[in-house]
Structures are given as C-alpha cells and as structure tokens.
Amino acid sequence: MVTSAMGPSPRVEELARSGLDTIPKDYVRPEEELKSIIGNILAEEKSSEGPQLPTIDLEEMDSRDEEGRKKCHEELKKAATDWGVMHLINHGIPEELIDRVKAAGKEFFELPVEEKEAYANDQAAGNVQGYGSKLANNASGQLEWEDYFFHCVYPEHKTDLSIWPTKPPDYIPATSEYAKQLRALATKILSVLSIGLGLEKGRLEKEVGGAEDLIVQMKINFYPKCPQPELALGWEAHTDVSALTFILHNMVPGLQLFYEDKWVTAKCVPNSIIMHIGDTLEILSNGKYKSILHRGLVNKEKVRISWAVFCEPPKEKIVLQPLPETVSEVEPPRFPPRTFAQHLKHKLFRKTDGDLDEKPTY
C-alpha cells in the first residue's frame, strides 16, 4: 500500500459533499470554451438528432462464415477510419465479469476519503499510479471535476499489486481477470485493423510492443455531482496517446466526441464497451485511422464513473512513425518520428510547432 501527502488541491469528492453552490474558479473553464459546454448532459443524451456514435457487433469477428467475418471487419475498419471511436457489442467479455469490475470500483470510491488517501499518488515525485485528483499538467492549466485511481493492470510482471486496493476484496481478482480478457480482445482488434491497412494480421500488435511490451493501464474516473456543470469539465478535451482505449461506465452520460466540427454526445448502450483509436495507431496508419478529440462532461444529478483502459507501447523501445506501407508520394508522412515518451511530452507540454497532428480544442 502506498501512502503520500495529498497535493494542494482538495479531492473533488470533498468539494461536492461540502454543499457549495458555486465551484472554485480553478475549475471554471476558459471563456472561449464555456459556450460549447452543455449544462444538462442527461437531457442531451436522450436526443436522437445529429450524428450517432457507431455500434459494431463483434459476434462474427472470428466467424468461419467468410461473409459474416468480412462484414464485421469492414464495419470495424470504417468506424476506425470515419470516427476513431465506437460502441462494441458481443465483444466476448462476460457481463458478470464486467459487473464485478464496476462493483469493485464503485465500492472503492464509496470508501471514506481518509481510507482512499492511503493509496494517494505522489505526482511531484513522478509517481502517477494510485488515487489522485489531477493526473498531470493539462493543456488549460485549469482543474478538472474528477478524482481517479490509476494503475498498470497488465502484463502481470509489470504490475505492482501493493498499490492496488484491498477493499473491496474482489477488486484485485476482478480487475486482473478483466485486464487479461481485454488484452486478448485488443489482439483481435489489432489484427482486424492490420488487415484493414493491407498488412499481415500481427503487424500492428508487433509495432506497439507485442505480447511482452504492450502496457495496459486502467484509470477509474470518478465524477461527483457538480453544482455548476455548465462551467466545468470532468476531463478536458484531448486525444488518447494509446494504441487503443477501452471504456466502461455506469450508464450515466458524459462522453462527448468532436465530430464534423461539433461536439456529439455518446449514448449509453447497454452491455457495450466504448473503444477509442489512440494517437499511436493514428500515427502508425499515417492518419488513416482517427484519434478523435473527446472530453468528459459532468452533471448536477448523478455521479458518473468510467473505467478507461489504455493499451500503450513501451516508452523508449519503439519509434512511432507512419509505417512504410501507409506512405506514398500522394500521401507523404504526416507525423514526425518520436518515441512514445517523446509523444507524451509533446502532448503534455502543448503543441506549438504547427504539426499536422494538431487538433482543435473547442
């Protein structure tokens, strides 16, 4: 179990429970961003107007029926190309296991703040794993309306169970099994996306680290009720640095995607996993697969919890750059070569060099 002093910002959970009517100014978004924030995301999620996040049925992803398999592969490729994010259904991970993961995470955040503080991270010392309220320096310098728990969950030899919650008792077994099954699903998805680029099916997995070096990390995001949701964000606009990101949530809306120059609210689809294409695959595919800008909204009425699992390449071993097969005279490389660590630094400390991977924020 890791202990450390809490940082200067109070836990958002404590702010929410204090009965305040207005949020501290450190949580208020910049003026130019406020005009796009919806105060009632719960009502917005019920709207059927505008574009809708695609739902991909994976039931026939490995089917012996060639027609069904090809149809599934094409739909997955199209969603990765057009949106870069999708709902996955019939993904093969048992509903009972997902329910256990959600229950364990919810129970952890229901513990008294004092108990959770025993798992607090120490960002000043470079230790981001554990319980916290701000993962890293973000783009705006503003605080986000969330607390979180962040840790490496796979492969087993790279995890540190000493920092995992021991309460509730099912947290470690449920999370470990979920990470293992999600890692296997990632292999299947990467195979389909490789084929979609005209590559051998194992190519993308190899390029992001393979069985030994691809790191799987989980961030449980806890978004308390917010008295002024029209002024705050749970997670500011960003793209994921990962190869793939898989997200569960407690069926409370909040995720928005920046699609066709406007913010689109993701629906709550039962028994689905949301999957994002991350920057890593966008770079390797030379932009053919999209890493979409997205953000998390909060609301007055309900606590929102999400479980984001990031599949990431090793920081220094691999140089990320467009694969030769994705480049031509007509489509020259859109991204400069960088290690994953260099890409992380590039993202965290703002992009000021006019790269083609720069994305709008609002």
Swiss-Prot record:
<feature type="binding site">
    <location>
        <position position="240"/>
    </location>
    <ligand>
        <name>Fe cation</name>
    </ligand>
</feature>
<dbReference type="InterPro" id="IPR027443">
    <property type="entry name" value="IPNS-like_sf"/>
</dbReference>
<dbReference type="GO" id="GO:0046872">
    <property type="term" value="F:metal ion binding"/>
</dbReference>
<dbReference type="GO" id="GO:0031418">
    <property type="term" value="F:L-ascorbic acid binding"/>
</dbReference>
<comment type="similarity">
    <text>Belongs to the iron/ascorbate-dependent oxidoreductase family.</text>
</comment>
<feature type="domain" description="Fe2OG dioxygenase">
    <location>
        <begin position="214"/>
        <end position="313"/>
    </location>
</feature>
<dbReference type="GO" id="GO:0002238">
    <property type="term" value="P:response to molecule of fungal origin"/>
</dbReference>
<dbReference type="Pfam" id="PF14226">
    <property type="entry name" value="DIOX_N"/>
</dbReference>
<dbReference type="GO" id="GO:0050589">
    <property type="term" value="F:leucocyanidin oxygenase activity"/>
</dbReference>
<dbReference type="GO" id="GO:0009718">
    <property type="term" value="P:anthocyanin-containing compound biosynthetic process"/>
</dbReference>
<keyword id="KW-0408">Iron</keyword>
<comment type="pathway">
    <text>Pigment biosynthesis; anthocyanin biosynthesis.</text>
</comment>
<feature type="binding site">
    <location>
        <position position="294"/>
    </location>
    <ligand>
        <name>Fe cation</name>
    </ligand>
</feature>
<keyword id="KW-0479">Metal-binding</keyword>
<protein>
    <recommendedName>
        <fullName>Leucoanthocyanidin dioxygenase</fullName>
        <ecNumber>1.14.20.4</ecNumber>
    </recommendedName>
</protein>
<dbReference type="GO" id="GO:0009805">
    <property type="term" value="P:coumarin biosynthetic process"/>
</dbReference>
<feature type="active site">
    <location>
        <position position="304"/>
    </location>
</feature>
<dbReference type="InterPro" id="IPR050295">
    <property type="entry name" value="Plant_2OG-oxidoreductases"/>
</dbReference>
<dbReference type="InterPro" id="IPR005123">
    <property type="entry name" value="Oxoglu/Fe-dep_dioxygenase_dom"/>
</dbReference>
<feature type="region of interest" description="Disordered">
    <location>
        <begin position="1"/>
        <end position="23"/>
    </location>
</feature>
<keyword id="KW-0284">Flavonoid biosynthesis</keyword>
<dbReference type="InterPro" id="IPR026992">
    <property type="entry name" value="DIOX_N"/>
</dbReference>
<dbReference type="Pfam" id="PF03171">
    <property type="entry name" value="2OG-FeII_Oxy"/>
</dbReference>
<keyword id="KW-0847">Vitamin C</keyword>
<feature type="binding site">
    <location>
        <position position="238"/>
    </location>
    <ligand>
        <name>Fe cation</name>
    </ligand>
</feature>
<comment type="function">
    <text>Oxidation of leucoanthocyanidins into anthocyanidins.</text>
</comment>
<dbReference type="InterPro" id="IPR044861">
    <property type="entry name" value="IPNS-like_FE2OG_OXY"/>
</dbReference>
<keyword id="KW-0223">Dioxygenase</keyword>
<keyword id="KW-0560">Oxidoreductase</keyword>
